[in-house]
Amino acid sequence: DSLAIDVRFPVANLEALLARLHYVEDHTSQGSLAVVIWTTTPWTLPANQAVAVNPGLDYAVVQVDTDHGQERLLVAKPLLKDSLVRWQIECYRVIACGPGSALEGLMLHHPFYDREVPVILDDHVTTEAGTGAVHIAPAHGQEDYAVGSRYDLKVDNPVGPDGRFLPDTPLFASLHVFAANGRVIDTLKAQGMLLRITRINHSYPHCWRHKTPVIFRTTPQWFISMEQHGLRARALEEIKKVRFTPDWGEARLQDMVAKRPDWCISRQRYWGVPITLFTHKQTGELHPDTLELMEQAAQRIERGGIDAWWELDPIELLGTDAADYVKVKDTLDVWFDSG
């Protein structure tokens, strides 16, 4: 059972939007104009960096009368009737239409922060539910992160490892994300950006061990690049040298290697083989003597076990550089460790 909200993202430049659409003959319209998004995770809105539409869908601007008076709202045409029912709006007029592809680059006002966010295109936007416009928070979802990377969006993660907003987060500092849902909704109401709030029953990921809801948040990790030094190409060539039984195994492995993303080899656990690196406190860059330091760390671990790394005082290896560097506490993916 979750709260679902429809939120206005006001169009920053009305002329820029209307110039991209096809008007209905003899149309008349008035009031503010907003793109409406629908979300079941209000707490992710502080991290919003864009609104995505499907380039292959048709969108409509409708003239409606709401509690805020006359206004114009943009929604995907296949979801128009369902959206109007959800908004409890019976009378409306379609005043303009156009493809989602025409909306790319349009700038919108964030619903409660003083910044503008772009409209971007993403084929993952569907007509299963909502409005056909999806708010994008690259810090809080795999698909959001992927489309955000394509558009070079800022990955702004305002949530700490304890599930609370960071102390410098405007309006929601130190609030737990689930407790912040109510604060976000109140803020949207105060700003006049909340169009509708409903409750829905839907599936949501839970921790298999604790049976509690989980959240998605970006964190710094270590990766092995599939492209640098030609790793993917070399792996594909080596596969050709292997005899497979049955034969179809070769095509399957080739497909897996050809499509796989970079390998995330780091984990945040209290046990496991340590990643013996030191990173600069300010820049995050590796220490310039990293290879030599890894060899020294390996020798210590060979003598004293993996606890030798956890017990190591950085000054023992870095000397005066220790003041500027942090010892990495991540562990290796067990599949990497297995060889």
Q: How does the language model describe each region?
A:
Residues 119, 194-195, 325:
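Generic structural signal for residues in well-ordered beta-strands
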Residues 50, 57-133, 142-146:
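Protease-associated
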Residues 1-46, 66-68, 102-107, 115, ...:
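Residue patterns forming the tRNA-binding/recognition surfaces of aminoacyl-tRNA synthetases
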Residues 112-120, 329-339:
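Active-site-adjacent "gating/activation" loops or surface patches in catalytic cores
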Residues 1, 82-96, 103, 290-317, ...:
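Amphipathic alpha-helical
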Residues 136-139, 178, 323-332:
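Conserved phosphate-binding loops in nucleotide/dinucleotide-binding enzymes
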